[in-house]
């Protein structure tokens, strides 16, 4: 049996529970954990809110099974609904279960320790493994396929946009030149190539390939598009008084979360108007006053918490219909990208074209 409790330590657990709990105090409250993983956060939510039910979504079937077993052992299975899906299918998951509104939505965007430590998934640059990087192994797109089929311009774009890699062009050119002689099949091959390309004097702390690995993982799984699609779905599904709580682990995720939440935290009128109409008032309340970070004690106990940023908002009034419509259109457009991207290696081109049309 896998020792789940020792594999994965939930990040900022007390803060997350304190943010979620007030929305789950009433009878028949419903919470959604969009990134269930090994259920560390969700178990704490259910223990704190004994009247609540929780829907746990995860695209990793292995993690979902382990989480369900853990819920059974904790005596919480009767209030837990596991769902095998990507979190950007939130609307469909709730519709299929006849649920119109929920009370709290939680997202922990970090990789689980199970995924990082599993040697055959290729998420980590610390040991050799196949270039896979899929969170859902039923999906066709892998890191190996990207490195074999994307042209240099596509590789530059994902390394620059998703990895913020300074040497994107040099790495992309080296990949294209190398694959003509020998295909990339393992993480060790990619590690060696990046090590040869990135100058010693300009390397970030740690492994020089970490940004390339991050970029490939985001591209394989469509992570940022899925996040940008899920946030508006979550907002549209929350009751007034409902809460959206999100943990992110790199700047691209945090920027996406911060930008989305900011839409509901500001007055929706041009500057200088003498009177602000009621319908233009903010519809979110900032619960974290920016972002909560892990303190030195948590980082010492759980080094993977070092980069976390926790943000949360409460729906303070009915979201105006124009905003609901805007959220729905955003989610639908990005879901179309994800459907196309998961079936072909052209995700980068599809996304780029959509973003260009939107300006």
UniProtKB/Swiss-Prot annotation:
SUPFAM superfamilies in alphabetical order: Putative methyltransferase TM0872, insert domain (SSF81799), S-adenosyl-L-methionine-dependent methyltransferases (SSF53335)
Reaction(s) this enzyme catalyzes, per UniProt: cytidine(1402) in 16S rRNA + S-adenosyl-L-methionine = N(4)-methylcytidine(1402) in 16S rRNA + S-adenosyl-L-homocysteine + H(+)
GO biological process: rRNA base methylation
Cysteine-cysteine disulfides: none
Main location: cytoplasm
The organism's place on the tree of life at top rank: Bacteria
Binding site for S-adenosyl-L-methionine: 39-41, 58, 87, 108, 115
Gene Ontology terms for molecular function: rRNA (cytosine-N4-)-methyltransferase activity
Documented EC number(s): 2.1.1.199
Signal peptide positions (record): none
Residue ranges, compositional bias (Basic residues): 350-359
Cell compartment(s), UniProt: Cytoplasm
Enzyme class: transferase
Keyword Metal-binding annotated: no
Record keyword S-adenosyl-L-methionine present: yes
Entry keyword set: Cytoplasm, Methyltransferase, rRNA processing, S-adenosyl-L-methionine, Transferase
Renumbered residue ranges of the record's region Disordered: 339-359
Entry's Gene Ontology cellular component terms: cytoplasm
Pfam families: Methyltransf_5
Entry function: Specifically methylates the N4 position of cytidine in position 1402 (C1402) of 16S rRNA.
Family assignment from sequence similarity: Belongs to the methyltransferase superfamily. RsmH family.
Protein name: Ribosomal RNA small subunit methyltransferase H
Phylogenetic lineage: Bacteria, Bacillati, Actinomycetota, Actinomycetes, Bifidobacteriales
């Amino acid at each position: 049996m896998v020792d789940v409790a020792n594999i994965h330590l939930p990040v900022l657990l007390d803060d997350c529970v304190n943010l979620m709990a007030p929305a789950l105090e009433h009878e028949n409250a419903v919470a959604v954990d969009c990134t269930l993983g090994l259920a560390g956060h969700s178990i704490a939510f259910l223990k704190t809110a004994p009247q609540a039910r929780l829907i746990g979504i995860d695209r990793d079937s292995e993690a979902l099974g382990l989480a369900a077993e853990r819920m059974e052992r904790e005596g919480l299975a009767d209030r837990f609904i596991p769902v095998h899906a990507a979190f950007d299918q939130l609307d469909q998951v709730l519709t299929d279960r006849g649920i119109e509104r929920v009370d709290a939505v939680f997202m922990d965007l970090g990789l689980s320790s199970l995924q990082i430590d599993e040697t055959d998934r290729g998420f980590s640059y610390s040991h050799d493994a196949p270039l896979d990087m899929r969170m859902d192994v039923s999906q066709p797109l892998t890191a190996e396929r990207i490195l074999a089929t994307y042209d240099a311009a596509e590789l530059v774009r994902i390394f620059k946009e998703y990895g913020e890699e300074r040497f994107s062009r040099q790495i992309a050119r080296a990949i294209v030149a190398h694959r003509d002689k020998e295909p990339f099949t393992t993480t060790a091959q990619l590690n060696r190539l990046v090590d040869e390309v990135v100058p010693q004097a300009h390397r970030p702390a740690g492994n020089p390939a970490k940004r390339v690995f991050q970029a490939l993982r985001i591209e394989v799984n469509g992570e940022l598009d899925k996040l940008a699609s899920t946030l508006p779905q979550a907002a549209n599904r929350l009751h007034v008084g409902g809460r959206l709580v999100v943990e992110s682990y790199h700047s691209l995720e945090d920027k996406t979360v911060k930008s989305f939440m900011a839409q509901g935290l500001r007055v929706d009128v041009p500057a200088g108007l003498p009177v602000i109409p009621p319908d233009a008032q903010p519809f979110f309340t900032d619960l974290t006053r920016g972002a909560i970070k892990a303190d030195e004690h948590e980082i010492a106990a759980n080094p993977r918490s070092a980069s976390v940023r926790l943000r949360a908002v409460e729906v303070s009034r009915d979201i105006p219909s124009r905003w609901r419509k805007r959220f729905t259109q955003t989610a639908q457009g990005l879901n179309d990208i994800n459907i196309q991207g998961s079936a072909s290696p052209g995700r980068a081109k599809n996304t780029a074209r959509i973003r260009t049309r939107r300006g």
